[in-house]
Amino acid sequence: SLTEEDRMKSLEIVKSLIASYKKPLFLAGDMNAEPESDFIKELQKDFQILSNPEKHTYPAPDPKETIDYIAASKQNATGFAVISARVVNEPMASDHRPILVELRTAEKADKIFRTKPYLQNPVGNGITVMWETTVPSYCWVEYGTDTTRLERARMIVDGQVVCNNKLHKIRIDGLQPGQKYYYRVCSQEMLLYQAYKKVFGNTAQSTFSEFTLPVADTESFTAIVFNDLHQHTNTFRTLCKQIQDVKYDFVVFNGDCVDDPVDHEQATTFISELTEGVYGDHIPIFFMRGNHEIRNAYSIGLRDHFDYVGDKTYASFNWGDTRIVMLDCGEDKPDDHWVYYGLNDFTQLRNEQVDFLKKELSAKEFKKAKKRVLIHHIPLYGNYEKNLCANLWTKLLEKAPFNISLNAHTHKYAYHPKGELGNNYPVIIGGGYKMDSATVMILEKKNDELRIKV
């Protein structure tokens, strides 16, 4: 339109069409009007200018005026954010300079969740909820003893809410052991995160799940222990069928389950397989490292997917009147082996655990426990080669009153009664990932009796 009158009539036609559009509507082109004109002022009543009117667009060789615009209807202007807006330095292609606006559109609410939530670290009257989204998000957990009166938990570090990320870890503390809690996770997409401007998209809410922390004096529980799955989905699903009628309280993955992680996507895919397979949205899971979790390009990144007890890959905690001690053996070859390229120092990690074991074995919680369970990936007894931890740990453990040690790594099921190999406690070693050798352990504590079924 070359005249103001024609432009105004054209604008009326455009406005009459807006009401029928439910999605974001954009208007772009040569409007033959400068920013202070009556036409642009009238346009801005219903449209938001997305391009930068302070940058001239015409004539292309030496711009003196701004007459080209990209605008969005205000009626549906919440489904996107402007990332950048600029005039392209191109004086020859046309008599107008091209203008470019980069937008980020909002994801649909039902596409925001990448994974279901899974529970971690159910100790110290608290629990951690983790999940992943497909887009950067601001997240929180809504929880309570019933679904009509909910509190909100967020991840706050040094006074700042952790957000604008895809992998989410939120701790809920101050919980009452023995009390059933209901919770759901909420994720609101963050379309723009700038110093002085934030733009939010749609919000996704999960369905409600539930969990219950064990009371301090509980005498009965059931735990499931997997090992050496090596990302074999069919093996894992077959083992899950073996325990489908078992009601269990927590799950342990005793190493080499998420083995040799290549990248984030691969790790997320199999972790989701594991957590969903054991109903990790309401049954807490402990992930332990084997030597294969330490290998490949994403091995360091794998840590972000878990919430370790005490923020260490080794730990101890009580489940009722039973003490659980978990150790991390590290790699199965010396640090100076050529395959590690000088990038490992598991000698230091093993020595740290010497101090940890000394404190643990003399701790009140350990001494007062009715039963004591030791779990680590590489066996100290019954391994096909010497465990690199043996010289450091054996003397501490040979008199420790553990009732059982649950191990893995050899890919061959074995049971070694107390004393058979100089072991001060019975040792059970889980099988491998092949269908004919795979095992799953059921650890059952009833009153004063501790049973293991493999």
Describe every region a protein language model picked out.
Residues 1-109, 191-193:
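Active-site regions of metal-assisted phosphoester/phosphodiester hydrolases
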Residues 76, 95-97, 102-225, 244-246, ...:
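Acidic, histidine-bearing metal-coordination/catalytic regions of metal-dependent phosphoesterases
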Residues 2-4, 31-38, 59-65, 231-236, ...:
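Active-site environment of divalent metal-dependent phosphoester hydrolases
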Residues 40-63, 67-72, 167-168, 384-448:
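Conserved beta-sheet core of the metallophosphoesterase superfamily
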Residues 2-6, 150-162, 190-202, 222-237, ...:
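Acidic/histidine-rich helix-loop elements
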Residues 4-41, 137-139, 246-250, 278-284, ...:
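His/acidic metal-ligating clusters that form di-metal
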Residues 186-210, 265-362, 392-401, 414-433, ...:
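Extended active-site neighborhood of metal-dependent phosphoesterases/phosphodiesterases
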Residues 219-297:
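Conserved, compact domain cores that house catalytic/ligand-binding motifs in diverse enzymes
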